[in-house]
Amino acid sequence: MSTPTQSLQVKLLDPRFGDLWPLPAHATESSAGMDLRAALEAPMTLQPGDAALIPSGIAIHLADPQLCAVILPRSGLGHRHGIVLGNGTGLIDADYQGPLLISTWNRGREAFTIEPGDRIAQLVILPIVRAGLQVVDTFVDSARGAGGFGHTGVR
């Protein structure tokens, strides 16, 4: 388990944390994310194409306007079972204090059952840059220019 470099306020909204489930934590020194669990009362089966908002059982308060949190999918669930986030990425602003809900979508071909306590997403804390927009008529040339999708090729 890694050593935290910053404190994060968390409210436990589900009494199973601490007893049955550990708090979200970085699994290794190099882990960027902390796993979020499905704080369900009973197993939930998502049929192909189904989406659901699944409670994580926690609320966080970043408090620092220079930070945000993102909820990201777990790679194995998406690759092996087609279980991904319904909104792509969940963005948590520094002043949000409500429960973290995980928008979960079964894009796979088979039904998938999520059990209470399953690790279904991950939470990553990120610094943000608050940029002001500067309107210009032209940009300074870059090597890429306006080349868009597929412009740099695959090899």
UniProtKB/Swiss-Prot annotation:
NCBIfam families in alphabetical order: dut, PRK00601.1
Binding site for substrate: R74, S75, G76, N87, L91, I92, D93
Coiled-coil annotated spans: none
Enzyme class: hydrolase
The protein, known as: Deoxyuridine 5'-triphosphate nucleotidohydrolase
GO molecular function: dUTP diphosphatase activity; magnesium ion binding
Domain of life: Bacteria
